[in-house]
């Protein structure tokens, strides 16, 4: 089984690559495979037998609120070039995002198909929304929608690492937000690879929902940290949670949020 992972140098892509070692995984850097160049990508698929594409490459993730059209066009161009070469592989797994939705409103327990009722204002979100629409109408294309993800190897800039390392943490909007532990993404990817997945759009979320403060306090308990370092601002912000029914229906053996946070020790 030959797998191409785009964006394999980023946090999500590199994690997935490390945990699919039982397969023959291609992880080209940007200078080795230019996703913006249709001819380059077409040539790659001519010269390599690829079964699965896992699309993790993105643009604009660092500037989520930007409306710069460059981030919109870049995100769509990369995906368009992969889509145009769909005859060169069997399946594509897209790492989607809850930012496919309009985050200026509350998004609680959103279902997989709800994104069609949204057109995000941000370039990153709109790009991801359009990609999700194309995937919905393309056979053998899958969208795994990640709301938030975490792992003990993540950057110190991420929320849970800040809770551990910083002397004071301010939660401006204490909303309910879904996070998934990165190891729990792998079983669903393998389910798709093995042909055992009956759904092509899946919210990667757990059934139980937590506020940011609840997760921060939980982590403080596990790490023996002083909870008083946490300051909560607004508790009435917009939530960002998904319906877990489809993911739960597969009865995958998942580690879960609580044990994932324990693993930061």
Where are these regions (language model features)?
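N-terminal Rossmann NAD(P)H-binding glycine-rich loop of SDR-like oxidoreductase domains
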Residues: 1-21
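Mid/C-terminal beta-alpha module of Rossmann-like enzyme folds, strongest
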Residues: 163, 167, 188-191, 195-238, ...
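Conserved C-terminal active-site "lid" loop/helix of NAD(P)H-dependent oxidoreductases
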Residues: 44, 182, 211-217, 231-265
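NAD(P)-dependent short-chain dehydrogenase/reductase
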Residues: 121, 133-177, 182-184, 191
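Conserved Rossmann-fold NAD(P)-dependent oxidoreductase catalytic core, especially the SDR/UDP-sugar
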Residues: 80-121
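Substrate-binding strand-loop-helix patch
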Residues: 150-154, 174-186, 202-221, 255
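NAD(P)H-binding glycine-rich loop region in Rossmannoid oxidoreductase-like domains
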Residues: 35-74
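NAD(P)-cofactor binding segment of oxidoreductase domains
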Residues: 52, 66-93
């Amino acid at each position: 089984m030959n797998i191409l992972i785009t964006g394999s140098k980023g946090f999500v892509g590199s994690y997935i690559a490390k945990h699919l070692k039982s397969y023959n995984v291609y992880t080209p850097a940007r200078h080795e495979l230019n996703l913006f160049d249709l001819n380059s990508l077409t040539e790659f698929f001519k010269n390599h037998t690829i079964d699965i594409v896992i699309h993790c490459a993105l643009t604009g993730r660092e500037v989520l609120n930007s409306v710069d059209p460059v981030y919109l066009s870049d995100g769509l161009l990369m995906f368009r070039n992969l889509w145009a070469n769909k005859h060169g592989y069997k399946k594509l797994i897209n790492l989607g995002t809850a930012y496919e939705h309009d985050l200026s409103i509350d998004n609680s327990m959103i279902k997989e198909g709800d994104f069609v009722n949204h057109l995000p204002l941000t370039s990153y979100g709109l790009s991801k929304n359009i990609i999700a629409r194309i995937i919905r109408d393309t056979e053998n294309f899958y969208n795994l929608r990640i709301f938030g993800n975490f792992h003990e190897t993540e950057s110190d800039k991420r929320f849970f690492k800040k809770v551990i390392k910083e002397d004071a943490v301010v939660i401006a909007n204490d909303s309910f937000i879904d996070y998934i532990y990165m190891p729990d993404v792998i079983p669903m990817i393998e389910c798709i690879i093995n042909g055992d997945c009956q759904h092509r759009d899946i919210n990667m979320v757990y059934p139980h929902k937590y506020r940011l403060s609840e997760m921060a306090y939980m982590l403080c308990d596990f790490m023996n940290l002083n909870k008083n370092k946490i300051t909560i601002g607004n508790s009435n912000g917009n939530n960002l949670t998904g319906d877990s029914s489809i993911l739960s229906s597969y009865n995958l053996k998942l580690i879960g949020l609580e044990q994932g946070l324990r693993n930061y020790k």
